[in-house]
């Protein structure tokens, strides 16, 4: 949707805004999903135990292939550093804040957790941007920052799924509610964990690795 607007919107301002969102989200999406692919393939291998390494199953090849994607086109850690130090902090997160607000506009009056987590994210970004005492702190937080932003974007995507489903089929809630609940139960709690890690690091001026 955003990529389409970046190319085909009739409004130059909307095209420019969409292009900024694509630039910010590209390292997030690359890192988030290649890491998830590796972890998913590894989990499949673990289910089979030692037999998962037998070539005829093919899982061991998927594990290797998925691992390569975390290195290809810039390692995920470099992508995280690029996101935070080159795309977010130079303007203290102002562009990110503007873009997140635009994405949240369709959900005014609904999805309070999405809005609350966005506000908490902006406060964290401001805190990182105004830390002069540790020149390496932003580098150390970059991986958690990228992962946390990616999880927020996944939360946003689920809100769009819900909205589109109800527009197309008002009675079709069951079609998306189960996977959405699974996301809320198993995936979204990691966002809070990442926030806690970064907030503790900022409070103590060190990172627990």
Q: Where do the language-model regions lie?
A:
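Short, small-residue-biased leader/transition segments that mark boundaries at the very start
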Residues: 2-3
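Gly/charged contiguous loops adjacent to phosphate- or pyrophosphate-bearing nucleotide/cofactor binding elements
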Residues: 6
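Short, charged/polar, low-complexity loop and linker segments
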Residues: 11-20, 130-137
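Glycine-rich, flexible loop segments associated with nucleotide phosphate handling
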Residues: 15-26, 174-179
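Alpha-helix capping/hinge segments and adjacent helical runs
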Residues: 20-98, 185-208
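A glycine-rich phosphate-binding loop feature that marks nucleotide/adenosyl-phosphate handling sites
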Residues: 50, 58-62, 101-104, 136-144
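Non-catalytic alpha-helical scaffold/packing segments enriched in small hydrophobic residues
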Residues: 80-83, 95-102, 116, 120-123, ...
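C-terminal amphipathic alpha-helical interaction region
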Residues: 90, 106-209
């Amino acid at each position: 949707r955003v990529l389409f607007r970046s190319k085909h919107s009739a409004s130059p301002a909307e095209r420019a805004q969409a292009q900024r969102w694509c630039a910010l989200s590209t390292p997030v999406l690359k890192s988030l999903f290649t890491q998830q692919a590796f972890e998913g393939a590894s989990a499949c291998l673990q289910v089979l135990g030692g037999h998962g390494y037998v070539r005829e199953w093919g899982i061991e090849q998927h594990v290797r292939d998925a691992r390569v994607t975390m290195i290809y086109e810039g390692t995920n850690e470099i992508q995280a550093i690029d996101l935070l130090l080159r795309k977010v902090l130079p303007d203290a997160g102002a562009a990110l804040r503007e873009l997140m607000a635009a994405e949240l506009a369709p959900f005014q009056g609904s999805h309070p957790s999405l809005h609350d987590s966005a506000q908490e994210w902006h406060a964290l970004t401001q805190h990182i941007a105004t830390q002069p005492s540790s020149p390496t702190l932003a580098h150390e937080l970059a991986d958690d920052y990228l992962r946390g932003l990616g999880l927020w974007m996944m939360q946003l995507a689920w809100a769009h799924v819900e909205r589109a489903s109800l527009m197309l089929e008002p009675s079709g809630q069951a079609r998306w509610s189960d996977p959405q609940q699974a996301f809320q139960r198993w995936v979204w709690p990691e966002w809070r964990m990442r926030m806690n890690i970064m907030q503790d690091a900022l409070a103590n001026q060190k990172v627990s690795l």
